[in-house]
Amino acid sequence: MQNINIRENGLTVEFGIREDGIVELLDFTAEDVANAKTTPTDPEAIFPVVEVQVTGKTTRHMHAYKHNAGSASLDFRYDTHSLKETANGKELVLQMKTGYGLEAAYHMQFFNGIPVVRTWTVLTNAGTGNIGLEYVSSFIYQGVSGNGGQSYYKKTEIYVPNNSWSDEAQWNKHAASDLNLTGMETDGFNCPGFGMNRFWYGSNSSWSTCEYLPMGYAQDTETGEM
């Protein structure tokens, strides 16, 4: 496996390029904490850096309402990458291609002086036929609360910023298990070791912050990471 390692503004970021060309985000942690690389127990488990659902394509496994199992995600293979300086800080761009004309550019923008990134994905149809898209991820990482010895659903707290008119930024703390983010005790034997459920919040229409602010964070109560 080829690796892309970046240490920038207090962040440790590592991408892995598998022998088949699929790119995975292996590590995304603060420099001062132990390494929390994604280490799936199933050797056939693949965590692509971009999740895409193409109309007519199937899914890789059970996923319920989560958008992390589109079979088209495994069609994207590494092409090139660049790390360039911008006015705000360094920007990584990973270029990936499929065999049917759909191409992806995964961007990770670092910011000078703070351990924060902004990520987004640009898809381009370089082929001759129409391609239907149902969703594309902007950021996906399998290693949240990956340090320590406890399972994520037993130690993760999720902070949600409720919002309203003249009642802004009302942060609320929830245990992962209280949000139905539980795990499976069995990992293997056709069981993935993690639950099928998602936790979602957001807004629509012209008032983007009507009920929630577009932010949030998770804390690992075992290690103190946020």
Language model feature labels by segment:
Residues 4-226:
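Polysaccharide-binding surfaces and accessory modules of carbohydrate-active proteins
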